[in-house]
Amino acid sequence: MSVSRKIIYNVTASSISKVITTVIALVNIGLITRYLGQEMFGNYVVALAFFLLFTALGDFGIYQTTTREISRPGAKEDEIVNNAIGLRITISLAVIAISPIFIWLSSYSNELKIALGIVLFAFFFASFTQLLIGLFQKRLLMDRVALVEMFGKVLQLALVAIGVKMDLGFNFIVGTLLVTMFFNFIVIFWLAKKFVRFKPSFDIAYWKKFLYQSFPIGLSVFVSFIYFKADSIILSWLKPSADVGLYGAAYKMIENLSFFPGMIVGLTMPIISYNIFSNRKKFETIVNKN
């Protein structure tokens, strides 16, 4: 199959999966909003915002840089990926070690503080899943990732439905995110073992060169978080949870529908990286088509 056809296939498969996932997510949000009510849904929105904050803090551009580097001609894939994993472990553990201090010093309710602890561990699994996705992007196998994410959403919906039916409470609903992220990580890791022999590396000299390239990307990710999601956290400091819930319900609708541009860029980035130096004409063609 030609590269163009592979891209079209991946975009089509990912789009179909994402449409199904979006429908599931909207049903999920509907169940959660009705079950929790406006005030507790506000706490749920805050918990999700902190999940994205932890993700932004621990990003450092590692995923994007890894995907770019392994996609270049003659790349030492095992070395790049294993050093990226070692770096991700170090940064993620630092975020997990430091964040609880700020959580417990905050003025949030104890129930919400527990929820923030849950999403902190969800971030840990999500960050590694994101890193491994680069291996599939390089090989234009994002249909597999899309399928795993779709089943993850189905699992979360089933757990939320059980939680609502049995009245298991707010933190059980938040916990479904942790279970989903763990499920996604386990399956993606199992699939990725076919591509790389995983053995985390802690080469400080390599990390310095890597971070020199990745940190500006990580900074842009954090700025994007501030632009798109920091408003929910700031609102939770200024207004009651009920107001945050009202704002968050409307915002979730937009969030679930604005995925196509980022998906297309993600699918084509490995090919762009491969051709930027080796085949300039093809590189320009792909960029123009994007």
Residue ranges, per PLM feature:
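Interhelical loop/hinge segments that connect adjacent transmembrane helices in multipass membrane
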Residues: M1-V3, I7, D143, N171, ...
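Membrane-interface junctions at transmembrane-helix termini in multi-pass inner-membrane proteins
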Residues: S4, E69-R72, F125-V148, N171
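Signature of the first transmembrane helix
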Residues: R5-Y63, I96, P100, G152-K153, ...
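Membrane-water interface segments that mark the loop-to-transmembrane alpha-helix transition
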Residues: Y9-T21, A47, A56-I103, I114-A115, ...
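Alpha-helical transmembrane segments of multi-pass membrane transporters/permeases
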Residues: N10-I20, D78-E79, F121, F136-A161, ...
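Helix-loop junctions and terminal segments of transmembrane helices
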Residues: I29, G58-A75, Q137-K138, I254, ...
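Alpha-helical transmembrane segments of multi-pass membrane proteins
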Residues: L53, L57, I89, L93, ...
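Hydrophobic alpha-helical transmembrane segments
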Residues: G117, V148-K194, I254
